[in-house]
Structures are given as structure tokens and as C-alpha cells.
Amino acid sequence: MRFRHHVALATLIFSSLVASMAMAGVPVQWSVDVHAPIYNPPRVADGVVYFDTAQSKGPNVFSAKNGKILWRFMTGGTVLMPLTVGHGQVWVASDVGSTHYLRAIEAKTGKLIWDYTRHEPPECMCSHLTHYEHHLLFAQTDGHSLYAFYPVGNIPNRRLWAFTGDGAKLTAPVVVDHTVIFGSADHSIYGLFDKTGKIRWQQKTGYGFMAQPAVWKHEVIIGNRGGIVHAYSTTTGTTLWNFTTNGPINTTALIWHDSAFIASGAGDRGVYALSAKTGKQLWYTRMADYTAYAPVMAKQILVVASQDGNILGLSAKTGKILWRSELHGIPKSQPVLWKGDAVLKVNDHKIMAFNAQSGGLVWTYHSKNVVTSPVPKDDSVYVGTSGGTLVAIGQ
């Protein structure tokens, strides 16, 4: 199926701050009605907001400053995951029936640079899309395959290599020391040579992995569904240390200085601080309920959202609870930092911001529709809604 490139959107309505007075106390800078649901979080880079809608089926590109449209690209299919931006390109994965596309679009103009097409049964082509400094693009497909692409340059063979597992779902990869590292539901963690995709090392454990690995120096740290935290050499896969918790680990470790902070799941309901070098426990703080999202660090305060409807600030050095604030709902996203505040999605219709040092509520954005996870960038926090509104919140 061919696609169309639109430069203008005739039905676009720009809503001013005055039209948003129903959200009293929320510093809305601008909002744009695009008349189509926005389900994936937007991406923001170089003063531009990129997002897709259920009807546009491709990138919509707006000025981050004032919400005016810059260009629009129609893929002709269903967008499968949030857009990825880098190296002056926008990457979008989409499908039409049994045909799967991965396209690179010029970020400034909306011009198609290249596309990769694949034909097979209609299932999710892409669940993770990432890039790194060596200009390789990795797309995880079908839940068990990993592809590498050259995203830049005029070359005839865009795809570099492909890794296919045994059908088990893979985590998002990290790239360090020329090694592509990821966990798998087949109970293994893999390290691949980044230029060839061949297995550099593989470690088998007793449980599957769900979360992306974290990196500390030349060490990769990852927890599994059995509650065990593993640390491996990035180049050899040698086991450096193991630490056992009492609950499944479904989130990525937070690395801060020489410490790794681990959120343990149901059955444990706590946060561990471990030495990244030795795996020694530094402290453990039990909470009223587990956290489904990784914590974030704000000036030596660890901010954690708990499934019991609270957000907490812990001392990074001791684990002591410094503050606790009610969400009046269930957290639906990892907290993100913006101008000293911890911002997160609560339930399906609310974005809340708390002072990361004191826990005080700063503002709450309410929507009649389901909102995306918040995306902070520079002077604004960007949110899309299922009602077709893109909102920029800022001071």
C-alpha cells in the first residue's frame, strides 16, 4: 500500500489557554485538537513534537513552542508503537494486514528516506525500537526476533543482521561495549556482537526476564521473574554477583553513582538498594504495596509510585521515607522529572505533579478522556488524549 505525505491539516483547531480554563491551576501553554485519538506518548526533540493518531497512521509534527503543525506523514497502516527520533530521522513501525513496515522519515521535512518491508502473518512487528551512537537501529519484532539496521547513508542493504530466538519474548536491548544485551522469557540473557548479531555470550537462569537491563560501567544488571538480580560482565557474560529478593522483578534497575535500586514486585513490596559493584544490600524499604514502575532519582531522593495509591520520597542513602503523598488513584506510568517535580499519570484520566523534595502537590491535569504518559522536555510537559487533544503544560 502506498502512503501520502500531507503538509497541511485542514481540520486542525488550535485551542488557546483561554479555552482551557476548566483546568484551573494547571499551567496549560497550548492545546491542539487533531480530531483523532492519541494513544502513544509523543516524542519531543529539537523544538518539535512528534506523535501519531489512530486515524493519521503516521507522524504528526508540531512546533513545541506554539502547537502549530509543521508536517504530516500518512503510512497507510496501523502504527504499532511510539515513534522514535534520532540522527535527524523519525522512525515509525506500522502494518497493513500481513505487511509490516519500518520507515525512516526526514525530521525536518517529512520526506521518506527509506523503508523496510516484511510479509508474514499479521502480528506485532515492533515492540521496541531504539538507536545508539554507532548509527545502528534495532527493531524487536514478533516478540522473539531482533533486527539491526543502518539508519543513515545511501546503502543498498539497509538491514545489517537478524537474531531469532525460540519464540520467547525479548526485553528491550541495551548497547554497551559493542554488545547488544537483552533478556528473554526463555530464561536466558544474551549478549550479541553489535556488528554481526552473533552470540557473544549467553547465560541461562531459572526464570524469565521482563525488564530492560541496566548498565553500570562494564557491568549489566538485570532482575528476573524469580526475584533474582544478576550482574554480568558486558563483554564476557561472566557472572559477577547475584542477589535474591522475595518478589518478581518487572522493572529496570535505577543506577545512581555506585548503587543499583531495585523495585521488587508482589510478595515483597519493597525497594532494595544494592552495591552495583558487589551486590551487597545497602538498605531495604518495605511499602504498603508493590510498585509497577521503576523509581527515579531527584537530588538524592528516590521517588517511587506505589500501587496502593501513594507516591513516596525515600532517602537514597538510607531508604528512610521522607514524604508520602496520596494520588487518589492508581499510578499508570513511571514518574518523570521536570523542573524539580515528579510527574506521572494516575488512573486513566489524570496527570499529577509533585514537588520531588517535599512531596507537595503542584498541579493536577484532568481530562474527560484517557491520557498518555507525560513527556517532559525543556519548558513543557506534553500529553496526548484519546479525545484527540495534544496538550503542552508549562510555566
Regions found by a protein language model. Give the residues of each.
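Aromatic (tryptophan-biased) beta-strands that constitute blades/sheets of beta-rich domains
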Residues: G25-Y39, Y50, K57-G58, K68-T75, ...
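Short loop/turn segments that connect beta-strands within beta-propeller blades
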Residues: S63-N66, E106-T109, Y150-I155, F193-G197, ...
